A protein has these predicted regions:
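Extended alpha-helical targeting/anchoring segments
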Residues: 1-214
Length: 214
């Protein structure tokens, strides 16, 4: 019961995100990975003006993963350990499978093939609709209702392209410190992200935000 924020809060309270002091130098030691769509603002800020065709939120808890320290250039292989089951070797099996996958894959230094895809799409807002919103924002700023506003729009396109190749092309053209590629299978959703901003990071009771607007 409850919404996705309630679910994540319960799972984190159960110790999913509990960190082992011996692993403090590793960037990610387990937990949930996913996204909250813009529509999730309705959970705390009132109803939305429009709805998305995509899920409002999707999260997963990986059983095994690679944590790469870009500062030290160290890669760490990790897996969940079922300590409640004596003799369980699932974590070791997951690590072996992960290591075998790395051996089979080409090196990360290999230059990916150029990605050229003819793309046609459309904006959600018309030119006139966008201009009307700009005018409304200017009036709000003049009245003193806000000192800053971020007007965004959605561009939609349909094309046949592999999401992982698209993400790698995005990172080449727009390298940024906060990038992500997520792939979900049910329903099929892929997220490619490359941003210079850190929205929010909370660790040990300290919250950090690194916006660039303003």
């Amino acid at each position: 019961s409850g919404d996705v924020l309630d679910f994540l809060e319960r799972r984190l309270a159960d110790g999913v995100s509990r960190r082992d002091p011996e692993l403090d130098d590793i960037p990610f030691t387990g937990g949930y990975v996913g996204f909250l769509g813009y529509e999730c603002k309705a959970l705390t800020l009132g109803p939305n003006a429009h709805c998305s065709e995509l899920p409002d939120a999707m999260w997963m808890r990986p059983a095994s993963w690679i944590a790469y320290d870009h500062y030290r250039h160290h890669a760490h292989l990790l897996a969940l350990d079922d300590r409640d089951t004596p003799g369980c070797n699932e974590a070791a099996d997951l690590l072996d499978a992960l290591a075998a996958t790395l051996v089979k894959r080409p090196g990360s230094s290999e230059e990916p093939a150029p990605l050229t895809v003819p793309v046609e799409g459309s904006w959600r807002l018309s030119r006139g609709g966008y201009q009307d919103r700009v005018a409304a924002i200017q009036q709000a700023l003049t009245r003193g209702d806000s000192y800053e506003a971020c007007l965004t729009d959605t561009w939609t396109s349909r094309c046949d392209v592999d999401g992982w190749r698209l993400y790698r092309a995005l990172r080449r053209r727009n390298p940024a410190p906060y990038g992500a590629y997520l792939r979900f299978t049910d329903p099929r959703v892929e997220v490619c992200s490359s941003s210079p901003e850190r929205f929010l990071r909370v660790r040990d009771g300290i919250a950090e935000s690194k916006p660039i607007k303003g």
